[in-house]
């Protein structure tokens, strides 16, 4: 039986609710990590974004049907190639499924629209509280994908850290592919060397070729985004981590030592006195 030893400091704000109805009597939908407020603002924006993704999904379904109708109207036989539409539809369906997953998560997610932002997923140190910041709806889909990777253990955060660890070029490729399914034009020109004809063109190699305003490659080896160049997840070992940061491995080893095949989770907890959140 849970008990509180003080009155909720914001009890008057929710006078329409019973003083005994924790989280509005709906602790699955509402989470109160600090005992101060129910984050309804994010839920309203979350609902808007969910409907926007549904609308995009329905648009692609309609376009696919138009394509099929036109194919047969021209007297063609057999099955039309709908792979382009199928990839877009399946990706948007995955994005909607991810929204359900993070809504039910043990983590708390706050949405933060910031005009001009390129998008981030940040952790509030020493909590299970995460903020998705995005400058437009397409970037929300990108960061939503990273939140899903957190839920799946593909990336992780330390308890005291703000930024993701174990994030690699394959994680970024998945996020950009989801972003493309929502808004193809939002990723056009990011990699000036490769023209994107379909979602299948967004690969790890494409991510490495993305250029920033200075002509640099933020996702490449030694890039400003500090992205792993090989597949990583929270179960990766120290050696696998070094392999993903090959261009930096000497400096990393000199600074932190050589931990061989020790799992990164153990390295963080035992060496840096910090654990993973995933």
Residue ranges and their predicted role:
Residues 138-154:
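Active-site recognition of the HExxH zinc-binding catalytic motif
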Residues 20, 25, 135-138, 142, ...:
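A structural signal for well-ordered alpha-helical segments within the folded catalytic domains
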Residues 153, 157-158, 162-165:
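Flexible, surface-exposed loop/gating regions in the mature catalytic domains
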Residues 1-50, 56-60:
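Short turn/helix-capping motifs enriched in Asx and small/polar residues
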Residues 162-278:
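Active-site or metal-binding loop neighborhoods of secreted/extracellular toxin and effector enzymes
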Residues 124-141, 165:
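Short pre-active-site segment immediately N-terminal to the catalytic Zn-binding motif
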Residues 1-3, 25-27, 150, 180-185:
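Glycine-rich, acidic and aromatic/proline-enriched surface loops and short helix-turn segments
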Residues 54-125, 133-134:
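Auxiliary, metal-adjacent structural segments of Zn-dependent hydrolase domains
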């Amino acid at each position: 039986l849970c008990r509180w030893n003080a009155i909720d400091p914001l009890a008057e704000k929710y006078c329409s609710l019973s003083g005994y109805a924790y989280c509005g009597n709906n602790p699955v939908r509402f989470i109160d990590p600090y005992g101060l407020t129910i984050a309804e603002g994010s839920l309203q924006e979350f609902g808007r974004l969910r409907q926007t993704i549904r609308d995009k999904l329905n648009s692609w379904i309609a376009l696919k049907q138009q394509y099929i109708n036109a194919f047969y109207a021209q007297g063609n036989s057999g099955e039309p190639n709908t792979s382009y539409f199928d990839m877009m539809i399946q990706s948007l369906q995955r994005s909607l499924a991810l929204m359900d997953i993070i809504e039910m998560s043990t983590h708390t997610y706050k949405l933060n629209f910031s005009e001009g932002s390129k998008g981030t997923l940040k952790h509030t140190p020493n909590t299970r509280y995460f903020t998705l910041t995005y400058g437009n709806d397409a970037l929300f889909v990108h960061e939503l994908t990273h939140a899903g990777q957190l839920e799946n253990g593909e990336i992780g955060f330390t308890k005291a850290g703000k930024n993701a660890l174990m994030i690699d070029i394959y994680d970024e490729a998945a996020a950009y592919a989801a972003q493309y399914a929502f808004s193809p034009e939002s990723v056009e020109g990011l990699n000036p060397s490769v023209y994107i004809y379909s979602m299948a063109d967004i690969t790890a190699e494409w991510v490495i070729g993305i250029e920033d305003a200075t002509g640099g490659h933020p996702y490449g080896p030694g890039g400003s985004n500090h992205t792993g160049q090989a597949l990583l997840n929270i179960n990766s070992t120290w050696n696998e981590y070094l392999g993903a940061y090959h261009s930096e491995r000497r400096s990393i080893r000199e600074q932190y030592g050589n931990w061989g095949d020790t799992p990164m989770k153990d390295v963080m907890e035992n060496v840096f006195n910090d654990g993973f959140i995933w």
